[in-house]
Regions:
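PLP-dependent amino-acid enzyme catalytic core
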Residues: 1-324, 346-348
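A cross-taxon signal for low-complexity, glycine/charged-rich
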Residues: 326-328, 333
Length: 348
């Protein structure tokens, strides 16, 4: 799938995504003094509401849905639910969000779920035990019946299925020839699975999981097999930077994200992007990237309005758009280590 394919067809194309997304270089002394170039792949600028990898994963699924109700899954702070709800509003599609945690049904909606509801998504809460079994056919059928959505087009949690993985392949194709290492934060692994397939030979793709547990590699291999028939690309995982798990943080991560925003004028989403950038700075300090190499970080999302403001997302003086030419050849990232983050704020 090419970048034009990933933009979708029909009504999706009418939403006018910005593809390919901008690729910009930032001047960061923590990389520069080690002879490493840092690029930001600004997927957060693809669309104001269907941001980054959410666009790349949702577009092919919405095409396949062909106007049917779209049902998907997520937690109370799911970026995926928000993107699906926004897509439904923009395209006039009915959406149903199956939310983990029956106990939430009687409580006021948090800002994330309130936004989903405002965008027209019908929320259906299920207990956590059933949610864990949602991939089992009998459990899924029961959930669909209870949600009065038996004819819905089902998109898995995080949006990662074969269609989504093939959609994310265009991200790798857009970056091919520009970097020696491409790094992306990982939730369900679908973005990395497609990115690695599109990046081509001679490029190392590094995933930074935001969940703990060390289970992601098997899932990525399964996603690539489903989408492409087998493994694709040279990829690895750097598992030290989850900060305790999904949507969990620490004072040093918040301080780092605020500092990065101040240095470069780039809004930093906290659940995924902050952990990715923190990991890359820490790895640079460990001399994990060879002198003369180019590292591209995929900015898969932006802070939501309750976290930050949409203003200021355009190109700024610290973010130079790159010409379409190959970055310097050189090193590869180091991945596959496990454990907690165990680090303070990377040195300035």
């Amino acid at each position: 799938m090419t970048s034009s394919d990933a933009s979708g067809s029909g009504a999706l194309a009418g939403l006018r995504p910005r593809l390919p997304s901008p690729l910009c270089e930032v001047d960061d002394a923590r990389f520069g003094r080690r002879g490493v170039r840092l690029l930001l792949k600004r997927d957060d600028l693809i669309h104001p509401e269907l941001v980054g990898n959410k666009w790349r994963k949702l577009a092919p699924n919405l095409d396949e849905a062909a106007g049917r109700t779209v049902l998907t899954f997520g937690g109370a702070y799911s970026n995926h639910l928000r993107a699906t709800a926004a897509a439904g509003r923009l395209l006039g599609l009915r959406t149903v969000g199956v939310v983990r945690g029956q106990e939430l049904a009687g409580r006021p909606l948090n800002p994330s779920l309130a936004r989903c509801a405002a965008d027209g998504m019908r929320l259906h809460f299920v207990d956590r035990a059933a949610y864990r079994r949602k991939a089992e056919p009998e459990t899924l059928a029961a959930v669909l019946r209870a949600a009065d959505a038996e004819d819905a087009y089902v998109v898995p949690e995080g949006g990662s299925n074969s269609a989504a993985v093939r959609g994310c392949r265009a991200l790798g194709e857009e970056l091919a020839g520009h970097a020696d290492v491409i790094a992306v934060a990982c939730g369900t692994g679908g973005t990395l699975a497609g990115l690695a397939a599109g990046a081509g030979g001679g490029v190392r793709v590094l995933g930074v999981p935001v969940l703990r547990g060390g289970f992601l590699a098997e899932g990525i291999r399964a996603l690539q097999t489903g989408a492409f028939g087998g493994p694709r690309g040279d990829w690895s995982l750097e598992e030290r930077f989850h900060f305790g798990g999904y949507a969990r943080t620490a004072p040093e991560l918040e301080a780092f994200a605020a500092d990065f925003e101040h240095r470069h004028g780039v809004p930093v989403e906290r659940v995924y992007v902050a952990k990715l950038l923190y990991a890359l700075v820490a790895l640079a300090e460990e001399n994990a990237f060879s002198r003369g190499s180019t590292v591209a970080a995929v900015i898969t999302g932006r802070p939501f309005p309750e976290q930050n403001d949409w203003s200021g997302l355009g190109p700024g003086p610290a973010r130079r758009p790159l010409p379409r030419e190959r970055g310097r050849a050189g090193g590869k990232g180091r991945g596959g280590e496990t454990g907690g983050h165990g680090l303070g704020v990377p040195p300035s």
